[in-house]
């Protein structure tokens, strides 16, 4: 056999042509020691986690490279540093002899076409090649397998896998013209055995069903596989917070183990990552890792990838390389169907009968946001149930008076509000998340007050409604508005900033 260090160098060189630098270095820079027992090369890595990851993600490709590059039989085995210290050399040698005997009795078969090898000339000239195994040669003991199964059970509890809300399913998603394509694609992904569409990027305004659809994918897969798949749902702000906390506590190994040892990642409201540069860099590494290992990624946003602001281009380009599907605001008939479905869910055993004029009132009053419309219906149903009323148009007007009045009098354009928040954040070089937060440093409070002022000034929205956007009360918004209005008359820099921001908003 050739020098075993040289053999490993050749294997590493081929792996570096297949995987990105970041993925390659993160995994294979942790090699601690290389030993040899006859035809077997034993490679020691830093932790049990890295060892398991190599077996799960890279071992098949390592075996293919070994078979292609070397005429003699070579067996590669990975052990963690701790396990290697505790191993007995004689036992290891005996295990090797048993493995060797098994190897010589194996039937030969053929691998399918080699993947991911455009830059490798030798791979290009060898489109098909033999493998020495009919099934993967076992290099783990029964005890190792039992530990792995037990660890998988523990990780489900430790990392809260399968955390989707069970109320969201494909069965209770009301399909219409505005969301039919997105629905069909989502269901196709949930039912496929192999990953063929990656990533799936679903975009549309707030409150029109993106969260329902993304979680329905996860729930369908969990139900189909009896929860054996590792599905993880996370809102972008939750990802930011978790990454920041784990980084501060120096627990990034736990973070990586949680997010990389999964089968399906569901990320809601990716636009919230705007301006969070370090988090974006970490998400980029995670995205590439999952993508290269053929793990499904599904993302939602309030806008298409090309319109995302303060999100690094190498992320948006990856989103655009997948399948982008949009969900539009539902038309009138679609909204009526949604209301009827919700009524059935409210009292499934004894469905309420609500007259068409009542449903028409709700459907015509809440046009752009299904979530708001469902909230109005729920208020009406509970109002009538609490007071023992039969639901008619008069009771509906009475129960929903304030909600309908605010919708008619405000009639605000949600896109304009989002644009104001985005422009102000960009102008002051902070994230939208920080703008909407409760941080009290001057660099956050001034932009926040300006955003409140502009929303009130430009759209003439009541203080309490503006406050609801920022999770503040009427008084806080009133004070912010008065402060900016007064100071802009004497503070030249503030006045100039307002003019520049307004110019960007109107452009």
UniProtKB/Swiss-Prot annotation:
One of its GO terms (molecular function) is lipid binding. InterPro entries: AAA+_ATPase, Chromosome_initiator_DnaA, Chromosome_initiator_DnaA-like, DnaA_C, DnaA_dom, DnaA_N_dom, DnaA_N_sf, P-loop_NTPase. Its main location: cytoplasm. Residues 1-72 are annotated as: Domain I, interacts with DnaA modulators. It is found in: Cytoplasm. NCBIfam families: DnaA. This is Chromosomal replication initiator protein DnaA. It comes from Onion yellows phytoplasma (strain OY-M). The gene is dnaA.
